[in-house]
C-alpha cells in the first residue's frame, strides 16, 4: 500500500518537477555565450562543451583552435558561469568533472587529481590560460548571446608547481595585481581579476 502511494504521488508530481527545471538553451545559444570570455580572435575556432536536451554534457562544437569552452550549466539556475581553457588542460578539467559527477566534493577533488598528476596519470601543461565570466543568472541574456557589464571576468594562467619564489608573484591577493593561487601544487595558477 505504501509503495503504491509513493508511486502514485511521484507519477502525479513528475510533470510538475520536470516543468520546474529551466529549459536547456539551444546549442547555438550555448555556443555563443560560452565563447564570450575569450578574446575575439579565439572564439570562432574554440571547441565548446555544453548540454544536450537531456542535460548531458556533450561536445556542441568540435573546434580547430587551442581553446575549449564550457557552457553555463543549466542546472545552476541562480548562477551563471562560463569558462574557456587551453586544450592542454582538458585531462585535468575532465577528471574534475568526472569526480564531481561521481559524488566527490570539495578538496577531495583536488587531492585525487594531485595524486594522479604526481603518479603520471594526468599530464599537466607547462603553462595554460583560462578565461571565465561569472555572476548571478541576471547577467546573461542567452537568446541575445550577451552578458551585462555586471558579469565578473577572471583570467588565469596555470603554471603547475609555481610559487612566489619561482615566479616573483605573491601568494596573497592584491587589488589590481596578479597573485599565485594554490602555490607549489599541480593546480598552481596566476590569478588576474580585473576588479575585486
Predicted regions: what is each one?
Residues 6-16:
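Bacterial N-terminal signal peptides
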Residues 16-22:
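Sec/Tat signal peptide C-region and signal peptidase I cleavage site
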Residues 22-196:
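Primary mode marks residue(s) on the alpha4-beta5-alpha5 output face of response regulator receiver
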Amino acid at each position: 500500500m505504501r509503495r503504491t502511494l509513493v508511486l502514485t504521488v511521484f507519477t502525479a508530481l513528475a510533470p510538475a518537477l520536470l516543468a520546474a527545471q529551466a529549459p536547456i538553451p539551444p546549442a547555438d545559444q550555448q555556443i555563443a555565450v560560452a565563447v564570450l570570455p575569450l578574446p575575439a580572435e579565439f572564439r570562432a575556432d574554440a571547441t565548446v562543451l555544453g548540454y544536450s536536451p537531456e542535460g548531458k554534457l556533450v561536445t556542441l562544437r568540435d573546434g580547430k583552435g587551442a581553446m575549449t569552452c564550457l557552457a553555463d550549466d543549466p542546472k545552476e539556475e541562480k548562477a551563471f558561469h562560463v569558462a574557456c581553457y587551453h586544450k592542454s588542460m582538458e585531462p585535468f578539467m575532465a577528471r574534475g568533472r568526472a569526480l564531481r559527477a561521481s559524488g566527490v566534493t570539495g578538496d577531495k577533488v583536488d587531492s585525487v587529481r594531485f595524486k594522479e598528476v604526481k603518479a603520471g596519470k594526468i599530464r599537466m601543461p607547462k603553462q595554460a590560460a583560462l578565461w571565465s565570466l561569472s555572476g548571478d543568472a541576471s547577467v546573461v541574456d542567452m537568446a541575445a548571446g550577451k552578458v551585462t557589464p555586471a558579469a565578473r571576468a577572471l583570467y588565469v594562467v596555470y603554471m603547475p608547481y609555481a610559487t612566489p619564489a619561482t615566479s616573483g608573484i605573491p601568494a596573497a591577493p592584491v587589488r589590481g595585481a596578479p597573485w599565485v593561487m594554490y602555490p607549489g601544487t599541480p593546480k598552481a595558477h596566476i590569478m588576474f581579476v580585473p576588479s575585486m
